[in-house]
Amino acid sequence: MNILLAFKAEPDAGMLAEKEWQAAAQGKSGPDISLLRSLLGADEQAAAALLLAQRKNGTPMSLTALSMGDERALHWLRYLMALGFEEAVLLETAADLRFAPEFVARHIAEWQHQNPLDLIITGCQSSEGQNGQTPFLLAEMLGWPCFTQVERFTLDALFITLEQRTEHGLRCCRVRLPAVIAVRQCGEVALPVPGMRQRMAAGKAEIIRKTVAAEMPAMQCLQLARAEQRRGATLIDGQTVAEKAQKLWQDYLRQRMQP
């Protein structure tokens, strides 16, 4: 069974200072993320962990990791190879992929046509862009069924049994392959950590690199606005500290201290 895990190496935006977010709001290019470390999305980590756990239990499969972007994805491609993925592919492009789900889906579909697969797995959405459209567009281009918000799945020959989170609860489906599924991280699985020997072997492994021509995205960012994050607060007025303390006790704390 040939399985492709498509992921996006996301910048660790939590490392940005508040002043950098404020400066980014003055333009439309967003904050400078060129020096930020990259992260593997939580959804993709969950998908990889589920795949590796089933392989460990004896399910035969051939795993390929694919990412689109720049060289920052190489670290995670090698990380997945150290965990047991047989093949790693980087579709290199300088294009802004935040608002280009159709561009991403089209090139993944082209890879599938050149390298036939049984199952394509993505995350539900990235932390950068967050459009969540890529798996649906990919499935439409391939003519495959698509299931999103998948929390768990089990592979069985030509079928996949999956648990899909819906607004009404958890739905269990048994689907004939091929298919596209978008996995949702639910906090129950963790990506393993490869050993030093596996890391060294993956560092020497070949990664397939293919250049993809950049295109002007159909949707472009026109303006950025920094959302204010404020907590509700009540100001206590008083001439002295003692007066403020008395009001705090009488109006807010006294009733909470009563048995």
Swiss-Prot record:
Segments forming a coiled coil: none
InterPro entries assigned to the protein according to its UniProt record, in alphabetical order: ETF_a/b_N (IPR014730), ETF_b (IPR012255), Rossmann-like_a/b/a_fold (IPR014729)
GO molecular function, one term: electron transfer activity
Disruption phenotype: Cells undergo an apoptotic-like death upon DNA damage characterized by membrane depolarization.
Keywords, alphabetical: Electron transport, FAD, Flavoprotein, Transport
Subunit architecture: YgcQ and YgcR form a heterodimer.
Function per UniProt: May play a role in a redox process.
Family designation: Belongs to the ETF beta-subunit/FixA family.
Name used for this protein in its record: Putative electron transfer flavoprotein subunit YgcR
